[in-house]
Amino acid sequence: MAGTRRKSLQNRQVGSLLIFLCISVGGATTIRYSVAEEMESGSFVANVAKDLGLEVGKLAARGARLVSEGNKMHFRLHRKTGDLFVKEKLDRESLCGKADPCVLHFEVVLVEPLQSFRAEVRVFDINDNAPVFLNKEPLLKIPESTPLGSRFPLQSAQDLDVGLNGLQNYTLSANGYFHLHTRFRSHGPKYAELVLNKPLDREKQPEVNLTITAVDGGSPPKSGTAHIHVVVLDVNDHVPQFSRLVYRAQVSENSPNGSLVATVTAVDLDEGTNKAITYSLAQNPEAILKTFQIDPQNGEVRLRGPLDFEAIETYDIDIQATDGGGLSAHSKVLVEVVDVNDNPPEVMVSSVSSPLPEDSPPQTVVALFTIRDRDIRVGGKVTCFLREDLPFVIKPTFGNSYSLVTDRSLDREEVSGYNITLVAMDTGPPSLSAETMIEVLISDVNDNPPIFREDSYILTVRENNSPAVFIGKVHAEDLDLGENAQITYSLLPPKNGDLSVFAYISINSDNGKLYALRTMDYEAIQDFQFVVKATDGGFLSLSSQVTVRVVVLDDNDNRPMILYPLQNGTLPCNDLVPRSAEAGYLVTKVVAVDGDSGQNSWLSYHLLKATDLGLFSVQRQNGEIHTLRQISERDPMMQKLIILVQDHGQPALSTTVSLNILLVDGFSEPYLQFQDPTRHSRKVNPSTKYLVISLVILSFLFLLSVIVIFIIHVYQKIKYREKFTIQEHFYDDCNFSNNLVQGQGNGSLSRPCPYEMCSATGTGNSEFRFLKRFMPNFPFPHATGEIKMEAGSSLPPNSDRNKSQRLEGHDQVSDDYM
């Protein structure tokens, strides 16, 4: 037996390597594969990328993943290669039980954009389970008078495999009394019956031991055995008789435990203990024994466990009635499970795209989900809808799969996220529903430019301000988030292109605060305007502009300026008034202006002082000076007035002007500027005399020093001339640099000669000392050597006399520069 199992395992491993892959596309959206069970973890199934017609690199780029309809995924996808592998060993019996075919459903989900493909893997059964008898040693009591051909049903063997690998046949060990007959159930495994071939004789053989073997159809086949112990009973003439050979019943799947299913009845014509009948479910599969029970006395069959129409629709129950003498009879109860709408629909979300950009176009896939209703036969059609009015709609994709897509434009600034409730409802009765909530966040895109709070700004700054003084702030808001809402401020020149505004103002790029760069002067500029640009930090930045006007406020920083009468800084202006002038005579008018503006430039005129305050008056508003009365002979000829001109600033600034008014008899006499006679009558101050004497003495000493220095200088010059001789030739034409001193003689020489000169600084005189000629004397072939003398005569060249005269001419040039 161990060798057989080892060989079977080897064959199974070989079969795992030679997997038959059946690939098809259902409705162009479903891919199907077939694999054998018991494949080891990591076994290759198929290449999904190839079957879907996708490039291998796109699986990883689009975040491909597998989503199972159940709670567990049995496969894994290699994103780089597109290969599909078994995640763990597959056991068809634990996955699907007796269901055939065994199909595992999952989806291949891709994102960016969201897309899904339905896939199915059919798990083929291998013969990895042997038939098993639950009761290894069943006991049968058969009366010796049992007629030939009597049948005795045996407990069926259980084989978890399906199809050919499941239970196929029974065999019985060789004996002289019984042979075996295999029977079929409409729903359930095959079972065997013992058929009596030879009459029993308790006196000859009170017991018979048999071995029954259950065999499946695998290759190689597997089997299981049970040992039957037959006890031959003494004669019991009558066996129990059921009222029906087959009982039929219908039970709703939602019936509670203990519900009555059916009542079987059997009678026995014997008397005494042989007439007492006991009912049992001895020869039934384990699933029936867990679900039903029978009262041994009255034959009532009741529910022991829950029913599930979606799992098992009908039950075939074998009922055994045994009398007191050991004789038994069998009957069947066929139970049909009635489906009720007891399962609400299930909503299974396989993928959600969140966050979702707010600029996503309509029909963008947001989520993928499937709906399953186990009561689809009675529940009717399942509908799916959204509980609220949201910018999303549900679209069917294939089968029971759906996608949630956008229905209209999204705006994160209005709604930053959605809690979407998916409702699935069947038609009942009664109608059942299920809800699943999907949270979808809306991500921001830069679709809102900065917006200034004001259409335009007017700011004020007072003149004479300190540099870098804060004068105001502009503020813009951006409805976006993150970097898309980070605003940077900058200055733009006004529309007229005047860039000088940048010399007056600066802006903090982070907060929009404006500062004055320099001190403002209202008299130079009264206002100016510029443009502030606000730019957000988005990848494709957006901006907006606003005009800012800065008004300079005037300060009273300018005193009134007198335009008339003109002031020469020493003497006041004189005006002539005839002595014949009457009261109200216009003498003159003081004209003044103020560089400020507004109230600071309003001027008023006041008579501050006067020789005779009762003789003249000043108009407060216009500065006109009039006589208050007629001039008399007693009035002094010189009238001195001091006029105060004052502005209206806070504090007020003022300027005074002095006027001399001469009272004359008429304007026909020539008039010289009148000097104040009191000056001649003033006495000379003794200190002034001493000052004048000191100045005279100092001047004399200075002149004497100059004469002495000049004599010494002439003497040194004569000594210096005796040490050098003059070269015979001079340059005809010479060009020298600008730092050389050129001297032109006053008639003694016809052309200048350059020399280096040195000035003795700090000596208090203007002495120049000629050290040497700047350039050597080279003879020129065309030099004439002719020098004009003071008397205008000329001598032949190269004569001694000419040489001496040239020397004198050279000294004359030096004297000219001295």
From Swiss-Prot:
GO CC terms in record: plasma membrane
Keywords: Calcium, Cell adhesion, Cell membrane, Glycoprotein, Membrane, Repeat, Signal, Transmembrane, Transmembrane helix
Bilayer topology term: Single-pass type I membrane protein
Domain Cadherin: 35-133, 138-242, 243-347, 348-452, 457-562, 577-672
Region (Disordered): 789-818
Residues modified by glycosylation: 169, 209, 257, 419, 568
Protein's UniProt keywords contain Endoplasmic reticulum: no
Any GO BP annotation: homophilic cell adhesion via plasma membrane adhesion molecules
Disulfide bond in keyword set: no
Residue intervals annotated with topology Extracellular: 29-691
Function: Potential calcium-dependent cell-adhesion protein. May be involved in the establishment and maintenance of specific neuronal connections in the brain.
Name of this protein: Protocadherin beta-1
Gene name for this UniProt entry: PCDHB1
